[in-house]
A protein has these predicted regions:
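N-terminal mitochondrial targeting presequence
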Residues: 1-41
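Short amphipathic alpha-helices and their capping/turn segments at secondary-structure boundaries
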Residues: 43, 48-64
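Active-site catalytic motif of lipid deacylating hydrolases and related acyltransferases
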Residues: 64-139
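Hydrophobic/aromatic beta-strand patches that form the interior of the parallel beta-sheet core
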Residues: 70, 109, 165, 231-233, ...
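Serine-dependent carboxylesterase/thioesterase catalytic core
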Residues: 73, 124-222, 260
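Short aromatic-enriched loop/helix-cap "lid" or pocket-rim segments at secondary-structure transitions
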Residues: 82-84, 173-180, 241-246
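Glycine-rich, phosphate-binding/catalytic loops in enzymes
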Residues: 86-89, 151-156, 180-184, 249, ...
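C-terminal catalytic-base region of ester-bond hydrolases, centering on the histidine
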Residues: 226-327
C-alpha cells in the first residue's frame, strides 16, 4: 500500500506561474521560454534612461566630489567576512570599489550596520558610523532604505547629508519577499523567527521588505527632505538556466516586470524624473557590488563575449556625477 507524502509549502512549485504574457505599464509583451524575447527596452524606457554598455570600461579620468562618499551595505551585507579568522584574508563587501574611489582622491567612509536588523535599528547604527567617520563634514551617501529613514526620521545633527544615491533598493518593496512569506505561512513564521534568533540572526528587516509594508507604512512615514538630493538606479537582466536568481526573477517578472533578480526597476526608482539616473541592462543584483564581475570578465576573455558592465566603472561614474552636481 502506498502512503501519500505531504510536501511542505516551501518546497512546492511557485504559485506564481510563468505566464507567456507579462503585463506592465499598460503593455503586453510575449515572454515565451521557447523563443527569444523581444527587447525589453520599450517597457524600460517608460521608467527613464536605459543604460547598455556605458560602464563596460574604466575611463582615464573621473571628477571627485567635494565631500566624502559613504558606502553602506544592504540586507545581509557586511564590511568584511572572515571564514578562517586571521589565518586567511577576509572577503570584503565593497571589493575593489572602495580602493578605486580612494585611488582617485575620493574620501570614502564604509558604514557597517546589522545585516538583518530592522530598518530603524540599522539607521541608528548608520548614523553613529557616519558621525565617527565624517568628523563634522558634509557627506554623500550611496546606500538604501536605512539612509532614507536616517535622513528623514533621525535627522543627524553632527553631520549633514547632501545627497543619497540608491542602487536597486526596494523603495516599494519586493514581490519576492511577499512570495517567501506566503510560502512559509503565518503559522510557521514564529518558529522560523525563533530559530533565527537562537542563532543570533536578527529578523527585523525581513517583514519590512514586503510591498504592503513599504507602500502603506514606510513610505508615508519617511518623506524625503527638501535640502537633500535623491538619485537612484535600477537594473534588469534575463537569468540563464543556471542562475541563482531564476526563480526570484520569474516571480518578480510576472508581478512587477523587469528586475535584477531581487528588486524590480519600478521599485528601484526614487527621486522623481530627474533623480532616476537610469536602468542598467544585463546586470544582476550581485553584479552591482562587484561580486560576480571578476569571474564573468574572466569567462568573457575565454569565450570572447565581452562584458558590458564593470561595477568599478559604475561607482566611479556615480562619484563623477556627484561632482558635476556640485556635491
Amino acid at each position: 500500500m502506498r502512503h501519500a507524502v505531504r510536501i511542505p509549502n516551501a518546497l512546492r512549485r511557485p504559485s506564481v506561474a510563468y505566464s507567456p504574457y507579462v503585463y506592465s505599464n499598460n503593455r503586453w509583451y510575449h515572454a515565451s521560454p521557447y523563443r527569444s524575447r523581444p527587447s525589453l527596452e520599450p517597457r524600460l524606457e517608460d521608467h527613464g534612461r536605459v543604460i547598455h554598455d556605458e560602464y563596460s570600461v574604466i575611463r582615464d579620468k573621473y571628477a571627485a566630489p567635494k565631500y566624502p562618499v559613504v558606502l553602506a551595505h544592504g540586507l545581509l551585507g557586511f564590511d568584511e567576512l572572515r571564514f578562517a579568522g586571521r589565518y586567511l584574508p577576509g572577503v570584503q563587501y565593497w571589493r575593489g570599489i572602495k580602493e578605486a574611489l580612494t585611488a582617485r582622491g575620493i574620501e570614502v567612509i564604509i558604514a557597517t550596520v546589522p545585516p538583518s536588523g530592522s530598518i530603524e535599528a540599522r539607521a541608528e547604527e548608520l548614523a553613529r558610523d557616519i558621525e565617527l567617520g565624517a568628523r563634522g563634514k558634509d557627506v554623500n551617501i550611496i546606500a538604501g532604505l536605512d539612509s532614507r529613514y536616517m535622513i528623514s526620521r533621525i535627522r543627524p545633527e553632527k553631520f549633514k547629508v547632501l545627497s543619497l544615491t540608491t542602487i536597486a533598493s526596494p523603495h516599494r518593496g519586493s514581490s519576492v519577499a511577499d512570495y517567501v512569506f506566503d510560502q512559509i505561512g503565518a503559522e510557521r513564521l514564529p518558529q522560523i523567527y525563533y530559530a533565527l534568533n537562537r542563532l543570533n540572526v536578527e529578523t527585523g528587516a525581513f517583514g519590512q521588505l514586503t510591498r504592503k509594508y513599504m507602500t502603506e507604512t514606510f513610505n508615508p512615514n519617511v518623506p524625503d527632505i527638501e535640502d537633500v538630493r535623491y538619485f537612484s538606479y535600477g537594473a534588469a537582466f534575463e537569468p540563464s538556466i543556471w542562475s541563482a536568481f531564476r526563480m526570484s526573477h520569474r516571480v518578480l517578472a510576472s508581478i512587477e516586470g523587469p528586475n535584477d533578480g531581487l528588486v524590480s526597476v519600478s521599485s528601484s526608482r526614487w527621486g522623481g524624473e530627474s533623480g532616476y539616473k537610469g536602468t542598467l541592462m544585463g546586470v544582476s543584483h550581485l553584479d552591482l557590488i562587484n561580486w560576480t564581475n571578476r569571474l564573468k570578465w574572466l569567462a568573457g576573455e575565454v569565450t570572447g563575449n565581452r562584458r558590458k558592465f564593470n561595477a568599478i566603472a559604475f561607482y566611479l561614474d556615480i562619484a563623477d556625477m556627484l561632482s558635476k552636481e556640485g556635491l
